[in-house]
């Protein structure tokens, strides 16, 4: 049981470090009101998690990569906070674009990941 916690913890740490690195890189390259870093992270995360779920990985890899790494990599809470910040700035065009694109492309990415992982 302890091994499972360690697997999830290490996976989450690696996923969070990758998320941070991507976020810093994207924010340094593109100065825009649209939160491209979180958008990119969550869309690629949706694809990768779909792929992992439908692949033939064993339970140890599912814990490490699926629960741990992808849990640390993707960020639902940042998505919501950034959405609220856009609302407070009354930047509704960007807000609704962000919400719509994240949900639509997230579903498409997850579907493609599921199909490719089979």
From Swiss-Prot:
Keyword tags: Cell membrane, Ion channel, Ion transport, Membrane, Metal-binding, Sodium, Transmembrane, Transmembrane helix, Transport
Regulation: Na(+) is not transported, but it plays an essential structural role and its presence is essential for fluoride channel function.
Biological processes per GO annotation: cellular detoxification of fluoride
Topological category with respect to the lipid bilayer: Multi-pass membrane protein
Transmembrane domains' residue ranges: 5-25, 34-54, 56-76, 98-118
Compartment(s) where it occurs, according to its Swiss-Prot or TrEMBL record: Cell membrane
GO-annotated cellular components: plasma membrane
Catalytic activity: fluoride(in) = fluoride(out)
Positions contributing to Na(+) binding: 71, 74
Molecular-function GO terms, alphabetical: fluoride channel activity; metal ion binding
Role summary: Fluoride-specific ion channel. Important for reducing fluoride concentration in the cell, thus reducing its toxicity.
Family the entry assigns: Belongs to the fluoride channel Fluc/FEX (TC 1.A.43) family.
Protein name, entry field: Fluoride-specific ion channel FluC 1
Species annotation: Listeria monocytogenes serotype 4b (strain F2365)
